[in-house]
Amino acid sequence: MTELQNSYPAATHSLPGLSIDDRFSDLESLRLFLNGRGIETKNTRIDRYQKYLKIASDQGVDNVDPKRIFKNVTDGRFQHGLDWYLYVLREVDELAHILKGLKVHVPGGVDERLKKIVGGSDFAALDKNSESRNIQFELRITSYFCLAGFLVRLDTETDIVASKGRQHFYIECKRISNSKQLEENLLKAKQQILARVPTKKRILHKYYGVIAVDVTRVAYSHNGLTFGITNDHAREVVQSALRSISEKIERIKFFSKKPPIIQCWLQIHIPGLIESPPQAFTRFSSLFVVNLETAISCRAALLLLNNVYAGADFSDPREFPSRKINTELNLPAGTQLWLSPNISDLMFTAGDPKSFKSINAKSADDFDNIAKTLVGGIIIKGKKYDFSMIDLVAFLAKKPDGFVKQLCERLAEDDDLKCRTELLCMLFLSKYPFYDSSSDE
């Protein structure tokens, strides 16, 4: 995949988001919903997600021992505490999205599918038996239609039949694990729709085919995590992957005119990190490929489909508001600062562009050892803030080479106390972008 060369404005505020407690509450609502329909969740992955979030809420993400909860996970992608947290968020946020739609409308035939999604491995990245996650994707798409006010059926041969007024959409869902499977699965979905859309005309009723495709693993073969410098950058990284996939499928003849298959809905569902400001996210990104041969004659149907996604309200009244990123730090009287006497050597190592990639590739033990290597600290009103080698590497990785070189030269001068103070303040603002001085009162 080509590397993005665009520029993005620096973030000034954080994204709104949900707390760990809110996500635990979502799982509890799901548990009650499932139990109310006779579906047991004890000792299932739902139960384990709840146990993880409960400990994370009470003791902090860094103090959870996930291997005691997810005992069968030995994959190398699950090393650091943040890895586990992001993978859990991916699962919980998708389940919460499904529940949100089912609270609006419960489709016929949903119970059999709900029983299936409770099973499966704990994480999609590790799921070798794809049935559970395939059905979960069907329910993810179903939720959009439920939220948009459609009457939905899941009790037919078609994955989803969604109706609004006289418009009926026959939707086949496919999760594709690599680009080689794109053509096979798209053509299979086409044949399924052609076989299942009613051929007998009914007065005032119109039927359309839609193909929904989860291409997460096509874009990201590891089915893991993604990363962005800012929120705009993170969004564009995923959208770029979707555009690349849409170009690959242009030559595949998966559309039809009669019955009309009018749209292919590509979606990526992936968790990740935003660097500035530091924040975790789960992203559901979509791109829609339209059958140009039917775009005019099926304009009303396409407008309905557009409203399914564009018109959906994904806001949550529980979201904590965005916060302004601090650009200055006022040090009160009595503030204490310290910096390693070897800071010049540490800066030389941390300023190497290879250092950032090297740290990300470290094993859990190596990562922890680097995290324990302190380069400096500040004590404000008796509260201690330490900065590790990882903090220094992450800070310098965001700065241009000229800035890093000049900073190293200034630090090499033993009497440049101002430069040392500036470095500590910049490290503080990098690590604590939303610092509130009143919290130290």
Residue ranges and their predicted role:
Residues 150, 176, 216:
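Residue-level marker of positions within ordered structural domains that often coincide
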